[in-house]
Swiss-Prot record:
Name the record gives this protein: Subtilisin-like protease SBT2.6
Record localization: Secreted
Key words of the record: Autocatalytic cleavage, Glycoprotein, Hydrolase, Protease, Secreted, Serine protease, Signal, Zymogen
Species lineage: Eukaryota, Viridiplantae, Streptophyta, Embryophyta, Tracheophyta
Native species: Arabidopsis thaliana (Mouse-ear cress)
Residues annotated as the enzyme's active site: 160, 235, 597
Signal sequence interval, chain numbering: 1-19
């Protein structure tokens, strides 16, 4: 008996040490594509882009059948207690996630009925004024009955870090029309385990959390991660409010109002699927379970501000893995998917969103800039940033460096110039003066914050504070932070050195270097009001860039990514009271943050408006409408520009390309009436996969349950509103099919342009398309010279009734 217990304990410890999470895909169709024939179960599949009635007896009985098969396989192979099944995936893919040892994973790979076994991998988050910037209040919301009808009955699902349900952006009473029951959504609402109150209120229509993989990996901490849909990070609340937050919510911090916030579709319903957490991000097994559940519940739109930390270990292509295959199933079910492009810019091939069925969103800087200035006693004015009030007008204040006002007893266990600890600074010397602090790497790493600098300065009675940057690494992002007292961050190193030189020259010291008299003076300007720039939009420095890649050897794909550009820099939106994702906004109700995480929900919300107006449109049709009506011209009438590094590693502006912005910056009002669309369905996506060189047909069958019987000839013939040819030899012709979604017949003139290395020709030069009808046209590209670089161009279809449809063209000429 004693020996048996010891053996059991040893075996359990062995599993704990070596077990990992694996995602297993099985033979047999998931619910979305099952056509019947398995043990007498009737078909559950519907036509592409249609929704399944997940409550029907057909669906529920087949779902139970699949789960029993998963359990039977595990029970047949392994002793009970030696493994843990985390999820059964039944709706979009047929498989399960399990916590098993590597040896057990190998047994699963060899087991009959198993198609693939993938070790789980991590994902990460890709982290007001924009409705006006995009023209929603004047040009879009009125067409749907006003802001209190914009997005009516459209459900947006958020795969993110949860939601703070008590925020006014999500209040159900902030509307003139009460929310009633939704006609088709079937998701459930979890309760707060502490208050026993539901997370749902009519505006929030579904709320669930997924953490089985996180728990199995030992990453989940219930004290800070919350075993509920509660947002312990802030990121999820921020993204949900961007897409579907209530209209006209005052953004207040430190006694100041920074405008009024609104979601893109303020009447849309919010369905929360929490699968990301504050410290470790998330696991694909949890994210796949969340997506599977969201589509089962009946969401219309999925917003994904999430991407992989690294490529999956066992897949050969970027398009085929459990995550992308699940999203393909979602699109097949009629769900539009917006995913953040990633924050690896401005470097090429940094995208984390690859597949043609996903709408990949890059981040733009809009026309609002928060600038401030510091005026020195010698009259020199230094530019900086800071969302703060000014010091008293017509008055200068002495400036004191934190390093010069240290208390003698302070232990130097941290960098005192960071100004994070008021107790180590001499209040008598700081009081009434401007505190001069240093912006060290600790601010980049998150162990120091501007919020704490402001609190330190206020505690010491300072008139304000200045942060100087003495050195900076490429990629360092400086965002303005709201402050309760006057404050400014001097982001330019040369200007910071001007300030330091002025301070050192004017400060009187004894022979030991101790200050005898502080004589440097300065005053801080008013940084509360934004300045509007006509150069907007611009592609943000951090926004991931193309070209798209088809495998993890970084070979270029014949598919343009990103797809579209949307606001993603300095976005005001809701924040969780528990949020710790941004140190500067801990405990606040709103946050001003940047990332492609912020761009994706803009597109999700705008897609909801398009879906509201055109409820029968497929995800590809919605994507096409957004892309073909986007703009490549900024507010000043110039071609879009992108932030980029110069040779000296300073940030500069260069002419942007489709690898920066895709088709262009979103134009919501035009997207509601695009004239023509480039539609595509499930078979088109399979055709793209089957014609992409290097993708094995067996692998396609494993992940999609669909054989390669489609004749597309070349992946560039996939019917998307862009053309990309990574290996153009001599001449190649591609075709596109357009459908007239306007109410009347229209004649389109087709023109094209291309950079000199590639010749371009379109045929026919004009065509008439009846309402509801489809026509094809061809684009022929010919290599004129091999330059070793991509050439960029555009095809434009200009309609006789005012519609204008554009698609970008990218191609690289090769000798063979």
């Amino acid at each position: 008996m004693d020996i048996g217990c010891k053996v059991l304990v040893f075996f359990t410890c062995f599993l704990t040490v070596t077990a990992e999470i694996y995602i297993v895909t099985m033979e047999g169709e998931p619910i979305i594509s099952y056509k019947g024939g398995d043990n007498g179960f009737e078909a559950t599949a519907v036509e592409s882009d249609e929704k399944i009635d997940t409550t029907s007896e057909l669906v529920t009985s087949y779902a139970r059948h699949l789960e029993r098969k998963h359990d039977m396989l595990l029970g047949m192979l392994f002793v009970e207690g030696s493994y843990k099944k985390l999820y059964s995936y039944k709706h979009l893919i047929n498989g399960f996630a399990a916590h098993v040892s590597p040896d057990q994973a190998e047994m699963l790979r060899r087991a009959p009925g198993v198609k693939s076994v993938d070790r789980d991998w991590k994902v990460r988050k890709l982290t007001t004024h924009t409705p006006q910037f995009l023209g929603l209040p004047t040009d879009v919301w009125p067409t749907g009955g006003g802001y209190d009808r914009a997005g009516e009955d459209i459900v947006i699902g958020f795969i993110d870090s949860g939601i703070f349900p008590h925020h006014p952006s999500f209040a159900s009473h902030h509307t003139t029309v009460p929310y009633g029951p939704h006609p088709s959504y079937k998701g459930k609402c979890e309760e707060d385990p502490h208050t026993k109150i539901s997370f749902c209120n009519g505006k929030i229509i579904g709320a669930q959390h997924f953490a089985e993989a996180a728990k199995a990996a030992g990453a989940f901490n219930p004290d800070i991660d919350f075993a509920s849909p509660m947002d312990g990070d802030g990121h999820g609340s921020h993204t949900a409010a961007i897409a579907a937050g209530n209209n006209g919510i005052p953004v207040r911090m430190h006694g100041y109002e920074f405008g009024k916030a609104s979601g893109m579709a303020p009447r849309a319903r919010i369905a929360v699927y929490k699968a990301l957490y504050r410290l470790f991000g998330g696991f694909v097994a949890d994210v796949v379970a969340a997506i599977d559940q969201a589509v089962h519940d009946g969401v219309d739109i999925l917003s994904l501000s999430v991407g992989p930390n690294s490529p999956p270990a066992t897949t050969k292509t970027t398009f085929l893995n459990p995550f992308d295959a699940t999203l393909l199933g979602a699109v097949k079910a009629g769900v539009f998917v917006a995913q953040a492009a990633g924050n690896g810019g401005p470097f090429p091939k940094t995208l984390v969103s690859y597949s043609p069925w996903i709408t990949t969103v890059a981040a733009a800087i809009d026309d609002r800039r928060y600038k401030n200035h510091l005026t020195l006693g010698n009259g020199k004015m230094l530019a900086g940033i800071g969302l703060s009030p000014s010091t008293r007008p017509h008055r200068s204040y002495k400036m004191v460096s934190a390093n010069d006002v240290l208390l003698g007893s302070s232990g130097m266990k941290y960098n005192p110039s960071d100004c994070q600890k008021p107790e180590v600074l001499n209040k008598k010397l700081v009081e009434g003066n401007i505190l001069l602090c240093g912006y060290s790497f600790n601010f980049v790493a998150g162990s120091a914050s501007i919020k704490k600098v402001a609190e330190t300065a206020k505690h010491l009675g300072a008139a304000g504070f200045v942060l100087v940057v003495e050195n900076v690494s490429p990629g360092t992002k400086f965002d303005p932070v709201p402050s309760c007292i006057p404050g400014i961050l001097i982001t330019d190193v040369s200007k910071s050195m001007d300030l330091i030189d002025y301070y050192n020259v004017t400060t009187s010291r004894d022979w030991m270097g101790r200050v005898k008299d502080f004589k440097a003076e300065g005053s801080i300007g008013d940084g509360l009001e934004p300045i509007l720039h006509k150069s907007a939009p611009e592609v943000a420095l951090f926004s991931a860039r193309g070209p798209n890649t088809k495998d993890f050897s970084f070979q270029d794909a014949d598919l343009l990514k990103p797809d579209i550009l949307a606001p993603g820099s300095l976005i005001w939106s809701a924040w969780s009271a528990n949020g710790t994702d941004e140190a500067n906004y801990i405990g606040e109700g709103f946050a001003l943050i940047s990332g492609t995480s912020m761009a994706a929900p803009h597109i999700a919300g705008i897609a909801a408006l398009v879906k509201q107006k055109h409820p029968q449109w497929s995800p590809a049709a919605i994507k096409s409408a957004l892309m073909t009506t986007s703009t490549v011209i900024d507010r000043a009438g110039r071609p879009l520009q992108a932030q980029q590094y110069s040779e000296t590693e300073t940030v500069t502006l260069v002419k942007a390309t489709p690898f920066d912005y895709g088709s262009g910056h979103v134009n919501p009002s035009a997207a509601l009436d695009p004239g023509l669309i480039f539609d595509a369905g499930y078979e088109d996506y399979i055709g793209f996969l089957c014609t992409t060189p290097g993708i094995d047909a067996h692998e396609i069958k494993n992940f999609t349950n669909t054989p390669c019987n489609f004749k597309m000839v070349h992946p560039s013939n996939f019917n998307t509103p862009s053309i990309a040819i990574s290996h153009l030899v001599r001449t190649q012709t591609v075709t596109r099919r357009v459908t007239n979604v306007a109410e009347e017949e229209e004649t389109y003139t087709i023109t094209s342009r291309m950079e000199p290395a590639i010749a371009i020709e379109v045929s026919p030069p004009a065509m008439t398309v009846r309402a509801g009808a489809s026509r094809t046209f061809s684009v022929t590209l010919t290599v004129r010279s091999v330059t070793g670089a991509y050439s960029f161009g555009q095809v434009t279809l200009k309609g006789s009734r005012g519609h204008k449809v554009t698609l970008p063209v990218v191609a690289m000429g090769q000798r063979r």
